[in-house]
């Protein structure tokens, strides 16, 4: 019904977002952009992060990257920076690389996220 229906436009009260709370900073990401790109690399509050939505839109993940320069992309079911590959658990696929740090990420309505994170970036 009306209370649970999602608004497919961006940044409307009932639009979906992917939200992260890093303590000193929280940020909401437009769900439509995430669906379109699959991967968003960002640096909120100088913390390098990557948010991933799987192609079937059933898996949402966030990771802290090792450096700002490291940019992750999604290939099949693997994240890669062109040098190292990572599983969606954040684990490095080879022993010469360090694993990524998993971050909590939330799929919420925009109005709900901004209510509980009033200073959120977007």
Features from the language model and the residues they span:
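Mid-to-C-terminal functional-domain signal that highlights helix-capping/loop sites
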Residues: 1-122
């Amino acid at each position: 019904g009306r209370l649970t229906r999602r608004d497919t436009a961006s940044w409307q009260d009932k639009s979906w977002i992917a939200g992260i709370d890093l303590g000193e900073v929280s940020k909401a990401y437009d769900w439509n952009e995430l669906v379109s790109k699959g991967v968003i690399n960002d640096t909120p509050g100088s913390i390098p992060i990557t948010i991933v939505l799987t192609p079937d839109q059933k898996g949402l993940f966030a990771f802290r990257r090792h450096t700002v320069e490291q940019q992750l992309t999604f290939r099949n079911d693997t994240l890669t920076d062109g040098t190292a590959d990572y599983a969606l658990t954040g684990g490095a696929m080879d022993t010469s690389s360090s694993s990524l740090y998993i971050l909590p990420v939330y799929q919420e309505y925009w109005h709900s996220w901004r209510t509980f994170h009033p200073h959120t970036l977007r």
